[in-house]
């Protein structure tokens, strides 16, 4: 029997003044590395400086010191985020038409940027309505501000200043927790305490405070705004907070205070904590009362979750015990050993977090249109398209990052001597089966999905529409997807007896929400065209996964290079004299994976953009007749590759190509410039190092002749550097091209 002292033990978890603050050291480029600190001999030095500045593993092998650097860097990151937010709010306060938009969001477009007339570029200030001229923004900030109850530009100023104060505070915290009071390694590895604090503090109290803000500030202010009250007449947020009678006039049960909460008489709160489902017909957004209810429920769940883990007192879950008890029938000793991996390798931990956060970000992308959370968001088509595209790209990059850090973990932190027969070892031992099967799946999906399109193009070209796969000829209906849609559409009143409408209008039914003559959302029909493109999605996702997973599973060794772990995370080839060993490093798999990620997400956002313009977005007449932007052409046009090129890319590029001389002309310039950036990448991807070194030496000779040669020797980019520059410009150029194409189109027609 274990006798525990009733007093919790006090652990000393910080070191005082571990590292002195030295501006002299910070001013010395490369101070973190003995080699780089010597200064440049060749131009490769500047590349190494950038490559290693944040690679804390390369500065020291002391896990505590690495942990402190990462922790401190997080505060720096938060500081930048607050600075960015402050800038957004400041633009809203200083350069925007927010107050005008608030008074008439259906006829006035959001703008928070006015171009100064320096060389005639004031043409970019288009008329967004209400007599305001500026650049139309598509970030969704106006909708968020309205939902949170901001009614004046003064409030935006105050928030911007508050964010600046927080940015300064975060910078200070980053310095303080590295130089003055740095946590010990034990603190970083105390997972139970971390879970309790993050669950109860960040998620629990965070959700609770947001729910409180929504109930006490957002709901009353939005109720007045929806009723058409002038924003200047509405009481200020602090008046609602300090004066309960004001709220009780809107929601009578407020006079009872918190009594119903603690006496479990919750139905008293039903007027401001609802369970309606569907969208508010006035704003086209989710009911704010539903959102407040959701955040209160989430807060309570997370507050409970934040008390589940064992810390100083002898009760609660212990993560190591949970993991080691987790055994399946086929997994041998189960999760034994995983705890040690995740508390000693931050790359392994980061990999999991990136995979989950990336997946979550993609889930957010899909919810932003199917359950639009903010007022007047659903009818702002430019913002809807931007939010979807943005979250898809971000989520995909995070998922590729997960593979990158999993591979770095395998190379740098994995210890095969202690990892015998645990789950990871078992996966590694049958990696050939995993990769070869996944490869087969990719080949199957590729030939079949592409084959369906090729069939349709051929039949269409030969004038045989009756032999095509389409909703009007040979149907390939997505029956499983339609079944799921139907199940959700029928849920209210049956499996979800408390809800009045379904979670999303997209599931089906007869409901349609339109705001100011524009469609906010309606049931989205799925047919043969969606079936075809979904299999392209499956194909591109599986190929991306194949490349990334192969990189992780073969990061340490392969039949081709058994000693790969000794070569490190990134290397060009396995030395001279071994042909056919280039592009095998874990880094190269990330590099190649990025291109397929780009393929995958491009198809997704093209599908979304066209589908919404064809089947959802549009105007509605007095008689209730809906006219879609592209007139429902998705179902018949997107079933051939020619249709994608002709009726999507070419037809919808007309706005960006013809934008010169209009307020959208900046998008035309970006469209052109981003194509150039993309093409520039090919120069790095298609040419070798030797070619450039030869050219450089000839140019250096000319400089020597003229006695203007630099002391630092010019060097061609290494193979890996060239690829890094190439993929960066490829992605940057491709994404910026798509951005210009989408926005010029949707701002012109939406």
Curated annotation (Swiss-Prot):
As for subcellular location, the record says: Plastid, Chloroplast thylakoid membrane
Say where the protein is mainly found.
plastid
Q: Which GO terms describe its cellular component?
A: chloroplast thylakoid membrane; photosystem I
**What does the cofactor field's note say?**
P700 is a chlorophyll a/chlorophyll a' dimer, A0 is one or more chlorophyll a, A1 is one or both phylloquinones and FX is a shared 4Fe-4S iron-sulfur center.
Q: Which domain of life is it from?
A: Eukaryota
Q: Does the keyword Thylakoid apply?
A: yes
Q: Provide the reaction this enzyme catalyses.
A: reduced [plastocyanin] + hnu + oxidized [2Fe-2S]-[ferredoxin] = oxidized [plastocyanin] + reduced [2Fe-2S]-[ferredoxin]
Identify the keywords attached in UniProt to this record, alphabetized. 4Fe-4S, Chlorophyll, Chloroplast, Chromophore, Electron transport, Iron, Iron-sulfur, Magnesium, Membrane, Metal-binding, Oxidoreductase, Photosynthesis, Photosystem I, Plastid, Thylakoid, Transmembrane, Transmembrane helix, Transport
Binding-site residues for chlorophyll a', renumbered to this chain: 675
Cross-referenced InterPro entries: PSI_PsaA (IPR006243), PSI_PsaA/B (IPR001280), PSI_PsaA/B_CS (IPR020586), PSI_PsaA/B_sf (IPR036408)
NCBIfam families from the UniProt entry: psaA (TIGR01335)
This chain belongs to the protein called: Photosystem I P700 chlorophyll a apoprotein A1
Species of origin: Pelargonium hortorum (Common geranium)
In the UniProt record, what gene is named as encoding this protein?
A: psaA
């Amino acid at each position: 029997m274990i006798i525990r002292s009733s007093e919790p033990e006090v652990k000393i978890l910080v070191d005082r003044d571990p590292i002195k603050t030295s501006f002299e050291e910070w001013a010395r480029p490369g101070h973190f590395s003995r080699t780089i600190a010597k200064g440049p001999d060749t131009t490769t030095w500047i590349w190494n400086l950038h490559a290693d500045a944040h690679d804390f593993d390369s500065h020291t092998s002391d896990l505590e010191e690495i942990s402190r650097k990462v922790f401190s860097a997080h505060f720096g990151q938060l500081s930048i985020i607050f600075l960015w937010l402050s800038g957004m709010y400041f633009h809203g306060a200083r350069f925007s038409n927010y107050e005008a938009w608030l008074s008439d969001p259906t006829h006035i477009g959001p703008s928070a940027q006015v171009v100064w007339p320096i060389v005639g570029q004031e043409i970019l200030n288009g008329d967004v309505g209400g007599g305001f001229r500026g650049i139309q923004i598509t970030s969704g900030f106006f909708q968020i501000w309205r939902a949170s109850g901001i009614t004046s530009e003064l409030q935006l100023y105050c928030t911007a200043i508050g964010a600046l104060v927080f940015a300064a505070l975060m910078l200070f915290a980053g310095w303080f927790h590295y130089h003055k009071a740095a946590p010990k390694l034990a603190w970083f590895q105390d997972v139970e305490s971390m879970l309790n604090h993050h669950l109860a503090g960040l998620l629990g109290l965070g959700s609770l405070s947001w729910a409180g803000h929504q109930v006490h500030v957002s709901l009353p202010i939005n109720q007045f705004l929806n009723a058409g009250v002038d924003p200047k007449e509405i009481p200020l947020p602090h008046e609602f907070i300090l004066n309960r009678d004001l709220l009780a006039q809107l929601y009578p049960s407020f006079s009872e205070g918190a009594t119903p909460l603690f006496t479990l008489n919750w139905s008293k709160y039903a007027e401001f904590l609802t369970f309606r489902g569907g969208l508010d017909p006035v704003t086209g957004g989710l009911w704010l009362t539903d959102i407040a209810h959701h955040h209160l429920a989430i807060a309570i769940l997370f507050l409970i979750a934040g008390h589940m883990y064992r810390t100083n007192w002898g009760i609660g879950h212990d993560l190591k015990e949970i993991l080691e008890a987790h055994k399946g029938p086929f997994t041998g000793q189960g999760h034994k050993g995983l705890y040690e991996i995740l508390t000693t390798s931050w790359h392994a931990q980061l990999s999991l977090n990136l995979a989950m956060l990336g997946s979550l970000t993609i889930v957010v992308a899909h919810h932003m249109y199917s359950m639009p959370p903010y007022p007047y968001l659903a009818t702002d088509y430019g913002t809807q398209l931007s939010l979807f595209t943005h979250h898809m790209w971000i989520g995909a990059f995070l998922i590729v990052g997960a593979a990158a850090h999993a591979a770095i973990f395998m190379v740098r932190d994995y210890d095969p001597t202690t990892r015998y027969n645990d789950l990871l070892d078992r996966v590694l031992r049958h990696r050939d089966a995993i990769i070869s099967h996944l490869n087969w799946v990719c080949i199957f999906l590729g030939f079949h999905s592409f084959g369906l399109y090729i069939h349709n193009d051929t039949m269409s070209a030969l004038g045989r529409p009756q032999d095509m796969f389409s909703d009007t000829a040979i149907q390939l209906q997505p029956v499983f997807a339609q079944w799921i849609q139907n199940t959700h559409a029928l849920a209210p009143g049956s499996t979800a007896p408390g809800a009045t409408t379904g979670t999303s209008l997209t599931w089906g039914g007869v409901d349609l929400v339109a705001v100011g003559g524009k469609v906010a959302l309606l049931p989205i029909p799925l047919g043969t065209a969606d079936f075809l493109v979904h299999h392209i999605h499956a194909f591109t996702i599986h190929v991306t996964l194949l490349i990334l997973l192969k990189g992780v599973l073969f990061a340490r060794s392969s039949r081709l290079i058994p000693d790969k772990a000794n070569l490190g995370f990134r290397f060009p080839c396995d030395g001279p004299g071994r042909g056919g060993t280039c592009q095998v490093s874990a880094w190269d798999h990330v590099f190649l994976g990025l291109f397929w990620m780009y393929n995958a997400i491009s198809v997704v956002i093209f599908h979304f953009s066209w589908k919404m313009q064809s089947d959802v977005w549009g105007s509605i007449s007095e008689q209730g007749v809906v006219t879609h932007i592209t007139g429902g052409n998705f179902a018949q046009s997107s079933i051939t590759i020619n249709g994608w090129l002709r009726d999507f890319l070419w037809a919808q590029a007309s706005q960006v190509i013809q934008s010169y001389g209009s307020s959208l002309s900046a998008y035309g310039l970006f469209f052109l410039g981003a194509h150039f950036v993309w093409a520039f990448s090919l120069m790095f991807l298609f040419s070798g190092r030797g070619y450039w070194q030869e050219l450089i030496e000839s140019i250096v000779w000319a400089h020597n002749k003229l006695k203007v040669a630099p002391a630092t020797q010019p060097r061609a980019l290494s193979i890996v550097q060239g690829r890094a520059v190439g993929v960066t410009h490829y992605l940057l150029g491709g994404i910026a091209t798509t951005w210009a194409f989408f926005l010029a189109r949707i701002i012109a027609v939406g």
